[in-house]
Amino acid sequence: MKKNTHPEYRQVLFVDSSTGYKFVCGSTYQTDKTEVFEGQEYPVCYVSISSSSHPFFTGSKKLVDAEGRVDKFLKRYSGIKQSAPKPETVVEDVLPKGKKKSPAKKKK
């Protein structure tokens, strides 16, 4: 086998940026940042979502997102007034008295 073809597999500290939850897992993630966790120094990777903040695992229905697309949208359009819904208009067929509608033609 060729040497130096595979990335280095090592223990990496993953930190959930929304909850602060930390866990160590084997990974090939490359970083220069390090952090001390449980007395050992690990390379660190900051993630936006993990099992401690994902709605599937937490059971909550709301997703905590740090400045996501929804927040940007709400900031942009928060000053716009929402128009009142338009009332529905009912259109009825009005025929003069004594006239009947012709029956619909059947297709063959």
UniProtKB/Swiss-Prot annotation:
User: Which residue intervals are annotated with compositional bias (Basic residues) in the record?
Assistant: 97-108
Q: Which UniProt keywords apply?
A: Ribonucleoprotein, Ribosomal protein
The GO terms describing molecular function are: structural constituent of ribosome
The molecule here is called Large ribosomal subunit protein bL31B
Q: Which family does it belong to?
A: Belongs to the bacterial ribosomal protein bL31 family. Type B subfamily.
Among PANTHER family, the record links this protein to: 50S RIBOSOMAL PROTEIN L31, CHLOROPLASTIC, LARGE RIBOSOMAL SUBUNIT PROTEIN BL31C
**Entry's Gene Ontology cellular component terms:** ribonucleoprotein complex; ribosome
Q: How does it assemble?
A: Part of the 50S ribosomal subunit.
PROSITE patterns, from UniProt?
A: RIBOSOMAL_L31 (PS01143)
Top-rank taxon of the source lineage equals Bacteria
Transmembrane helix among the record's keywords? no
Q: Name one GO biological process term.
A: translation
Q: Which organism is it from?
A: Chlamydia trachomatis serovar L2 (strain ATCC VR-902B / DSM 19102 / 434/Bu)
Spans annotated as Disordered: 86-108
